[in-house]
């Protein structure tokens, strides 16, 4: 069963004005950048974004604790999640933008792609001879969830790139237009 904040707790924030500040610019940036489109076609309001992020964070924590049999305490989790909600709602602290955008969405909840919470990553090309596609697969996978990827040039000149062979029949590869399809194409 997923972690959810109590309805009574959330109710007190539904009509509360968020302290965006900056003469409306803060709210404009929030609506443009972090407010996700809901199933009904409307954008999330701040209280809904905070709820999604907090519940997503606690779902991740609950899954980890239960997987390793560390003793989930539902009462303590509800209490600390409410404190986290209140602090985020009032902008006493904010998670990173990537967290506001992806935490608690299908990307993290269903697919388990927590890499989407990262801004950037790095991959080395040093061992290209061992696995030619590995750094490129990593780069594609991370890029497809919005992570910027840096790389080194240690693998430069470790193999020669030649043009296509023209003396054979061409083959057609159909790549599924999904994140997984494009990653697999590497």
Would you name each region that the model predicts?
Residues 1-185:
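Extended catalytic cores of very large enzyme megasubunits
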């Amino acid at each position: 069963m997923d972690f959810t904040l109590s309805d009574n707790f959330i109710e007190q924030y539904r009509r509360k004005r968020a302290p965006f500040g900056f003469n409306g610019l803060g709210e404009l940036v929030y609506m443009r950048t972090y407010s996700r489109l809901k199933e009904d076609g409307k954008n999330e309001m701040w209280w809904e974004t905070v709820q999604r992020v907090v519940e997503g964070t606690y779902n991740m924590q609950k899954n980890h604790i239960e997987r390793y049999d560390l003793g989930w305490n539902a009462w303590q989790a509800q209490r600390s999640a409410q404190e986290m909600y209140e602090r985020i709602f009032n902008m006493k602290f904010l998670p990173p933008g990537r967290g506001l955008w992806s935490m608690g969405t299908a990307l993290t909840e269903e697919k388990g792609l927590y890499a989407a919470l990262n801004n950037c990553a790095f991959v080395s090309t040093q061992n290209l001879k061992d696995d030619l596609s590995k750094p490129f697969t990593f780069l594609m996978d991370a890029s497809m969830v919005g992570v910027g990827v840096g790389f080194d040039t240690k693998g430069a000149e470790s193999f020669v790139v030649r043009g296509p062979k023209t003396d054979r029949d061409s083959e057609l590869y159909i790549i599924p237009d999904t994140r997984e399809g494009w990653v697999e194409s590497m």
